[in-house]
Amino acid sequence: MSSEIHSIIASNLKNAEKNCVPVGKISNEYPQLAIKDAYKIQLINIDKEVEEGNPIIGKKIGLTSEAVQNMLGVNQPDFGHLLKSMEVKNGAIKRISLLQPKVEGEIAFVLKNDISGPNATVEDVLEATDYVTAAIEIVDSRIENWNIGIIDTVADNASSGMYILGEKKIDPSKVDLKSVEMRLYMNNQLINSGKGEAVLGDPAYCVAWLANTLHEYGVTLKKGDVILSGALSAMVAAEAGQEFRASFTELGDVTLRFE
């Protein structure tokens, strides 16, 4: 696929975000696109953001549940980039600033050392992690009606939107991440729940997968990076006036309000 086509698709996605008007399914219009093309498209928009003063502060891992992988016909996760502008600081965001937001409860890793592939292990991840904490990711799609396949979501920065971290910082060696339980509430009503093992069996394994996959692109996970390790339960559509709380055993709570 030509770089010209990559640029056209990247521009269409960027305009969709800017104007809050989603585009049609990319993989329908360009059926010959491969996953490597999709990552190149993703990077075009990320590089532009960085050039404009919006730095990369971490990564997110998507498609970590077997059910979602089966739905999209893939057998591996994907990844996207977290930018400084994506972090929610005050616990509230404007619903109108997003297209089709959905909420997920996740375990976040914050690194104290770099992690390099291609042979990173769970042990390497735990040793390189400063702390783990509760997180809510707001996924969003620039593709109309969330009508996505693997190519579409990868090109669209793994359907990234925004995220918020909890305040409790836990040494990963002090908690069994696989057994951490999460309950997601909307307006104080329990919506769904999940455990750490829901993401490929172990959130730390997901981060190791990411480090090893990034090695193929010449990228290393860096000290200070925030890594969102994958949704512990199904994503939930969000609307103005709703407040979400993800409550984790060991890791505490994190709350987000849509205005």
Name what the model sees in each region.
Residues 2-201, 243, 253-259:
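Catalytic-core "active-site belt" of small-molecule-metabolizing enzymes
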Residues 115, 232-236, 250-253:
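Short, charged beta-turn/beta-strand-edge "cap" motif at the junction between a beta-strand
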Residues 120, 212-217:
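A short beta-strand-loop-beta hairpin characteristic of the jelly-roll/cupin
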